[in-house]
């Protein structure tokens, strides 16, 4: 488990607090492997736009029942708010992005890397400002986000019923039961 302690509960809690509510990106090959299970797993976008910049699939990490999940962000274009598509607002209460709980994916440590915020600040200050606005909204809402993620996982992995998640909403979410099998095989 590690050399912090013999207690797995302590280590799990320690790891959770260290990785949660920071931005991460996911290895392209791992995403491709997940996509073989569920074709709705999004792509890392390579060389987007006139500047040919990459736009990786990024999100926040949350640990749910010992599984590390990336909950992705997307732009504020054409999305509808629901229990599994959570809007993100800036300090002026303007909608700036969405957190796609329906697209959360389990990601082992070796297939994720923290976003270098200092590097983004130096190369793309506007994008840095957007990401900071997003994280400043997400962090105080961590408990609500985590509850929604736990609800989705309970429905998709354990076949439990949750009032907030209709059958249509559950079908809109990725196949977490099968994706977790890949995750567990990589640990």
Predicted regions span which residues?
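Residue-level detector of flexible, active-site-proximal loop/helix-junction positions
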Residues: 30, 77, 111
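Low-complexity, polar-biased intrinsically disordered regions enriched in Pro/Ser/Thr/Gly
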Residues: 35-50, 81-92, 115-122
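Compact nucleic-acid interaction/catalytic patches
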Residues: 48, 63-100
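GIY-YIG nuclease catalytic motif and its immediate N-terminal context
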Residues: 3-53
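Catalytic nucleophile-His microenvironment captured as a short glycine-rich beta-strand/loop
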Residues: 56-63
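Residues at the C-termini of beta-strands that transition into short coil/loop
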Residues: 27, 74, 108
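Extracellular structured ligand-interaction cores
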Residues: 54-56, 101
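C-terminal terminal-subdomain/extension
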Residues: 13-18, 92-187
